[in-house]
Amino acid sequence: MKARRNKKQVPSFRKLIKTSKVKLENKLKNKQFKQQSTIKKYRKEQRKLRQAVKDAVSKKPIPLEDPKSKRPVKRMEREEDEEEEALPLDMMDEDDLQLMKDLGQKASFLTRDLSSSEPVHIKKRKHESVIEKYEKVPRTLQTAPEKELIHLLPIKDKSGIIPQAREKPVTDVQQEEEAEEELEDEEEVIEDPRKELTIEEHVIERKKKLQDKKIQIAALASAILSDPESHIKKLKELRSMLMEQDPDVAVTVRKLVIISLMELFKDITPSYKIRPLTEAEKSTKIRKETQKLREFEEGLVSQYKFYLENLEQIVKDWKQRKLKKSNVVSLKAYKGLAEVAVKSLCELLVALPHFNFHNNIIVLIVPLMNDGSKPVSEMCCEAVKKLFKQDKLGQASLGVIKVISGFVKGRNYEVRPEMLKTFLCLRIKEVEVKKDTEDINKPKRFMTFKEKRKTLSRMQRKWKKAEEKLERELREAEASESTEKKLKLHTETLNIVFVTYFRILKKAQKSPLLPAVLEGLAKFAHLINVEFFDDLLVVLHTLIESGELSYQESLHCVQTAFHILSGQGDVLNIDPMKFYTHLYKTLFTLHAGATNDGIEIVLHCLDVMLSKRRKQVSHQRALAFIKRLCTLALQVLPNSSIGLLATTRILMHTFPRTDLLLDNESQGSGVFLPELEEPEYCNAQNTALWELHTLRRHYHPIVRRFAAHLLAGAPSEGSEALKPELSRRSAVELFETYSMAAMTFNPPVESSHSKRKDKFLPGDSFLNEDLNQLIKRYCNEAAPETPLDFAKCLESSSRQYRVNGLS
């Protein structure tokens, strides 16, 4: 019978040399375990070595006896007794006796060889002699003072580990006191020349120090800008100068460093957010260039974080009126330092909205918008406005709006109105316009498979598929920002804004924030949901009727109401007559004796109420408003008169039948009632615009030009037509152009150069010769010096008066 053949295949050479992953891992673990055990052994040896050295130092050596000195009698007797009790030498073996002699000569009382280079727990070999090690230990008299050993890092060579130590002499108290006295003397010597410096020398020395610091800052900044990846560590060196301790230049140097670091971060920061690396990314092998980039990003983020923490600490110390222990910077100078820190934070808020820690900057800036210091508050508000204006996507704006809304609610609506006025700079309106255009121009629709099968051949379908694929890829490449994401962010932002506005309308109607709220509602009213229109109009009318609002606040209410009605509110059946009546009766509140700040709001309201709602405005209402605007133009400042006359011109073009106000003939429908508060029933058709004749003699040339133009019927052509720079501008633009807020007259007043010259007669001024002679005689004569006697003159005059009375 055949022997059974082994079916196992002989392993190949490749399999023999191949090592499994488990084996490799086990090998690695064993290697690490051995290294750890070796380290533990080494630490144990070092611990024992230090303990042995301490024991050897702490033992007090017995001083050697002088053979010449006489020993005391008692000690001699005790030694004799010990000798008697000791084992006699004749009873010991020769080997033991020889060993005792050797031990006595070789000083075997030490247990360890301190000078040996071998480890403590080294294995003993047979050929080594234990006694020979102890001979290496020196025996010296301790006549010198005790010295403490400082243990250093050991050295390892072929023979083993060599411990290293250094002696530290024990200093006495007297030596320490002498050293302190020497230091004090040196300090006094150093301080003496400083006190002797004059003011001029002190200023020169400060300039020199400051110049050196400026050169150092410039050198570091230039090195970082030249190659940020290689010199990222110099950011730390530059940031360390924020802790300048020299009181002469501390404030200036810190300000320069803050500004320099801010500009550096704006220049070298990448245009993306740096995220922390995962464990898997850290463990993978990468190229040198990638590793260098990672190190740069990590260093940049860490230094940027520390820089922001330093700025936050400066602002916090200033707010809490704290000073550092060193007292290098005074409290007065700390305010300027804090303002520079706030300015840097504002710059970073605007310049780096995409980078790390942007939300942290927002949390720092928003409370400072409500700060008691006006420069700081204005600086922060301007930075937030700038961020809103340039934020295209809306991510940064949403973060700021969330923090502001929470801050206003947390302060119970007791904040500066400027905080809410920043909402007016949001770019939500522009996105809505883009959305409308995208709805009109819908994207191209691709053909379905069934449509392709019906109309195209097999080859055409293949080409069509490839073409559609390319079009999709091109569309994805061109779309840099997602419109859907943009609309989503702006919708969320708008919801938070309206929630803040409605809270203030509901809970804080007497708050100084109300004008800002009404102004914001007027701007974003077209974006409010239609469901809230009725309730919002009722609230606005209630606020107007309450009488607690100022004139400008009531105008904001009117403007908001008509913005609501001019947008989606066209579909609602709401009669805004009460708002027309309120504006008509309050127009005469404006006059030249007060500031004309409300004129701009009035011009906006008239544009929304009359020009844009021309189909809903009756003929009688248009006539009444034109008559009242011309009357108002007589009692306001020139720029306000120009704006009102420009609005009158637009209304005369919008409502052509209003030219009957230029005739002096009246109709038989009644008498004009100028004091009536209802514009519909004041019979404005029975009056004329006599105010224009008065305005033709106004001292301002532009007012005169507009008055003449309106009297001629506001023609578009001819001699009475306006110039293009006047006719093409809106009423608000003309009001701002000819404003005299800068205390300058526009157009400038021409200096009068009269051609007539005053003629003087040669010789005497008077033609009468007798009069000239009399004047010369009295001018040449010297006046007699007579004393003044008022009593005598009074008696003579009274006596003369009596005589005249009797006669």
Swiss-Prot record:
Q: Which domain of life is it from?
A: Eukaryota
Keyword Coiled coil recorded: yes
Q: Supply the alphabetized keyword list.
A: Coiled coil, Isopeptide bond, Nucleus, Ubl conjugation
Q: Give the induction annotation.
A: Induced between 1 and 12 hours following adipogenic stimulus.
What positions belong to coiled-coil segments? 449-489
Q: Give the residue ranges for region: Disordered.
A: 27-93, 167-191
> Any one Gene Ontology biological process term?
fat cell differentiation
Q: Which residues form the signal peptide?
A: none
Q: Where is this cross-link: Glycyl lysine isopeptide (Lys-Gly) (interchain with G-Cter in SUMO2)?
A: 332
Biased segments, Acidic residues type = 79-93, 174-190
Is Nucleus one of the keywords? yes
Basic and acidic residues bias: where?
A: 52-78
Compositional bias ranges of the Basic residues kind = 40-51
Give the CC-aspect GO terms. Answer: mitochondrion; nuclear speck; nucleolus
| Compartments where found | Nucleus, Nucleolus; Nucleus speckle
Sequence similarity:
Belongs to the CBF/MAK21 family.
> What is known about what this protein does?
May be required for adipogenesis.
What is the official name of this protein in its record?
A: Nucleolar complex protein 3 homolog
What's the source species for this entry?
A: Mus musculus
